[in-house]
Amino acid sequence: MDSDAAQKTWELENNIQTLPSCDEIFRYDAEQQRQIIDAKPWEKDPHFFKDIKISALALLKMVMHARSGGTLEVMGLMLGKVEDNTMIVMDAFALPVEGTETRVNAQAQAYEYMTAYMEAAKEVGRMEHAVGWYHSHPGYGCWLSGIDVSTQMLNQTYQEPFVAIVVDPVRTVSAGKVCLGAFRTYPKGYKPPNEEPSEYQTIPLNKIEDFGVHCKQYYPLEISYFKSALDRRLLDSLWNKYWVNTLGSSGLLTNTEYTTGQIMDLSEKLEQSENFLGRGTDVNEKRSEDKLSKATRDCSRSTIELIHGLMAQIVKDKLFNKVGLGK
């Protein structure tokens, strides 16, 4: 598989739609945006924004930035606009922040950089405003922690309209679907109606409590991706860099710590389920069955990820080492 084929596969897996350059989505109407911001329709409906459209260029920038951080969280800002109930992300840029394995903190340097970048963007004709922030959760899924919820609530108070995006670079498989989630928080005191459960995702045992406490304070947006013919050269340039890194690395070796952590986490979950089984009450048995079911799904997902990594290594071995060519 060459670079072009891999790029097309990536675009198909993530359902990236190609739009004509003259499409309305690429035009920025300053007056229209000002009217929307003045009207503030999101204040009347906490669930006002339902969808988010992300350009393929912004998507690849965010994924590459998140991947470069390794096991440390990274953070960046997104530029775009709003249209009806949809938020549109046109571009994204990284911020110089201090990241750890569990949180990311923006300091004065990051705010100065942010201001300078926004001013420079306007000088070259990019009039879009900041419409959200993104950060990474290396290896533990796309959701908002307690700190993330507080940060997003603050942003929605003073910088509306604003969205939070979470990228998991470890779970994002080469030439596969990007592990990404977009969220908005509810106002304080608001009780959301019972919603359908979102797509299941593996949450490490040491993160489950943080996830469970705050999961009702925000809601996910439906995500779609788009690109234009004008994006092609920029996307090609970024993809070539990404593709070389992909060929030169192994998911099995790069994610060794993540895989080991997953196995240890599964072991703890199974042990916890076993403890509930011995208590005898119907409530505990039901809870244990639920925990066992989730542990089984986590185990299946981990196995599939390992098989994909092994298959990728076999394909690269056949392509570049020419195993069996002389037979």
From Swiss-Prot:
Please state what class of enzyme this protein is: hydrolase
Q: What one GO molecular function would you report for this record?
A: metallopeptidase activity
Q: Which domain of life is it from?
A: Eukaryota
This protein's name: COP9 signalosome complex subunit 5
According to its UniProt record, where is this protein located?
Cytoplasm; Nucleus
Which coenzymes or cofactors are required?
Answer: a divalent metal cation
Entries under PROSITE patterns matching the protein: MPN (PS50249)
Q: What is its EC number?
A: 3.4.-.-
Modified residue annotations for Phosphoserine: S300, S302
A GO CC term assigned to this protein in UniProt? cytoplasm
Q: Which organism is it from?
A: Drosophila melanogaster
